[in-house]
């Protein structure tokens, strides 16, 4: 169940990044609120498309 939540959560963050054409303050705060690192989300098995977006903007998300 927790893995499913993490997958949906990461999808929401990735979608917000796509809609905003990059990392907005809201996307950064949403990502941080989840409490997962990108590496942890990768282990959970999030969608490859979502993972690619999170990895592309990793530096901005984790600052």
Model-derived segments and spans:
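Intrinsic-disorder/low-complexity detector
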Residues: 1-63
């Amino acid at each position: 169940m927790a893995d499913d939540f993490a997958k949906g959560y990461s999808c929401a963050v990735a979608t917000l990044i796509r809609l905003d054409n990059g990392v907005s303050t809201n996307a950064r705060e949403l990502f941080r609120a989840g409490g997962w690192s990108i590496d942890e989300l990768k282990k959970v098995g999030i969608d490859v498309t979502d993972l690619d977006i999170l990895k592309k903007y990793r530096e901005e998300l984790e600052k």
